[in-house]
């Protein structure tokens, strides 16, 4: 399940950058990419919940990582909304980077992650 989760969030990030790029260009297909992106949000959340469910003893850090992951998805939506409205998205991009960094750090720190830290 770990590989499915990693694959889903990697595809989500790629689709996010594609959606932002298409939104900036005013491409008509941006809406379709955003709908596919939202589908991958759901896949990422479901695989994350399945990973949480598979852990025998869940520490508070796992719950914190889950909340940080939801924060990443929320920040993605805020960036896309700001881009669509033509507003400055600098603060939202900063929030997304911080949320992603926290989530990746916790994901790599916890026992189910890779042994980097």
Curated annotation (Swiss-Prot):
Family as reported in the entry's similarity comment: Belongs to the UPF0344 family.
Presence of the UniProt keyword Glycoprotein in the record: no
One Pfam match: DUF1516
Keywords, ordered alphabetically: Cell membrane, Membrane, Transmembrane, Transmembrane helix
Annotated TM spans: 1-21, 39-59, 60-80, 97-117
One Gene Ontology cellular component annotation held by this UniProt entry: plasma membrane
Protein name: UPF0344 protein GK0697
Subcellular location(s) of the protein: Cell membrane
Membrane-related topology note: Multi-pass membrane protein
Protein origin, superkingdom: Bacteria
Keyword Transcription regulation in record: no
Major place of residence: membrane
Parts forming coiled coils: none
